[in-house]
Amino acid sequence: MAKGTKKSESTTAAAKKRSLFVDLEVCAKCPQCVTKCTYFYHPGNNGVVSVREHAAMSVVCRRCENPVCVSVCPREALERDDGGVLRRYVMRCVGCKSCSIACPFGTLLPDVVPYANSVCDYCLGRLQGDESPVCVTICPLQAVRFEEMAGELPKNNHVVDEHLVVHAIPWKKEGVK
């Protein structure tokens, strides 16, 4: 096996062990988002919006047993995954705000679920070159980091998917201990 191939494989393996870590509490303290994303397919779009949406939805959504927002969507743009987290199909969404109006808790705000969006690829191309994602290198408060997440996660850290871990204080139902 060639040396270059071995390095490429080890770099890819290392990239798979690390996750994008978004601290929503720190991120909320930032007066304005200065994070810019050079998402390959949408160079003019801030791809971080997609990561923030995904992170926020995983901790803000009340995960209703029978989510009304999903059933009222005329374009079937919302889907509830096995973990109860809502996922939005951006190409199906027409921005009608039916989901926002139907949400009994008021957590699906148009500001949280923007119409124009891209899908973050976690800068996988940069990871193969052993570089961090652009949002990580630019975030002034280090609310977005790229780090190893091995073993049991600290309290209030939530795995959203294989590349994303979110830190946020979760909501609690009233009367439930």
PLM-predicted stretches and their roles:
Residues 31, 76, 95-97:
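Glycine-centered helix-boundary capping/hinge motifs
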Residues 37, 45-91:
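Acidic (E/D-rich), amphipathic helical modules within compact regulatory domains
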Residues 23, 81, 89, 111-112:
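Acidic/polar residues at beta-strand termini and the immediately following turn/coil
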